[in-house]
Amino acid sequence: MNIYGLYENYQTIQEKRYVVVFESEKSTLKRYSRKDGTGVSIGSHTLSDEQVKILVGLNVDIIIAFDKDVSQNEVRKECEKFYGIRNFYYIYDKWGILDKKESPADRPNKQYEFMLKYKIKYDETEHKELLKWLKEKQKQNI
């Protein structure tokens, strides 16, 4: 699997020192049309091992900005792939800005920038929340 928009946005990503990872190519195009060349897309809400290697190799902060219908714990599972390797963040709409299937990129610049400003760092606390969720999920499957 490739990373859509990486070639076109590589220079801006290096200058800004961060990359925003979207699900849909449409989101990368939408942000680019708004003069924001920091976005790339992976075509789903699951990062492949190859995509992880490519993103880590950029040597910049990584921010996940998946659609609202992806749960916070599902986003945390993707963040876990970078835990302890890179500064990693995610956008989670706790304000009700997004509609059910909307991406942060679908919102006007002011709302997008607000959500980006209040991104959540995937740190030890977030890691523990994921482990707790996985444990509860495992209990339910027994």
Q: Where are the regions a protein language model picked out?
A:
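Phosphate-handling DNA/RNA-contact segment within nucleic-acid enzymes
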Residues: 1-58
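TOPRIM fold recognition
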Residues: 33-142
